[in-house]
């Protein structure tokens, strides 16, 4: 398990021969909005800066722990007659993202947790049906601004709700929706794409 790290972009035709402190960065989220959800099939961004499709809804603030990106791999070993491992290959791979939505009164945040059909109403005035979790996949985008104003955008084309944290309701803790989503295959085994410092219209 690892908290999402932010690295400077090295272009394919560049050669670096020295350590560079400007490539070290904190992962600060974009001011004004940084977590968005849309139905699968919505046009996905392919760079760090272009405007998102209008179908993407802001799902609000995340807790101070931000996002935890976890990868899980299994390996298979091949051994010879002496029990010596002669080959080890990765046999499976999966990726997930965990975060806590703390805009408890935002309709889009509640829908992200419970599913669109389980939530009716509007911000600050909702009815939420607590029921079997909705496994309808959604597309997610998270936006970070790295040191030096380098834009870092993570795109999950198909995310399925997979785990839900406990919800405590008392006066000393903020209300929120703690959930983990599984990043499904977007094609060719890719589960999510991160665009770091890629201007609008540029591709690598």
Residue ranges and their predicted role:
Residues 1-5:
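Gram-positive cell-envelope targeting signals
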Residues 6-109, 158-176:
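Solvent-exposed edge beta-strands and adjacent loop segments
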Residues 35, 140-142, 195:
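Hydrophobic beta-strand residues in large extracellular and virion-surface proteins
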Residues 96-100, 139-143, 178-182:
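Beta-strand secondary-structure signal
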Residues 101-105, 144-148, 183-187:
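Beta-strand elements of well-folded, non-transmembrane domains
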Residues 106-157:
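Short helix-loop boundary/capping segments
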Residues 150-204:
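Mixed-charge, glycine-accented linear interaction segment located at domain edges/termini
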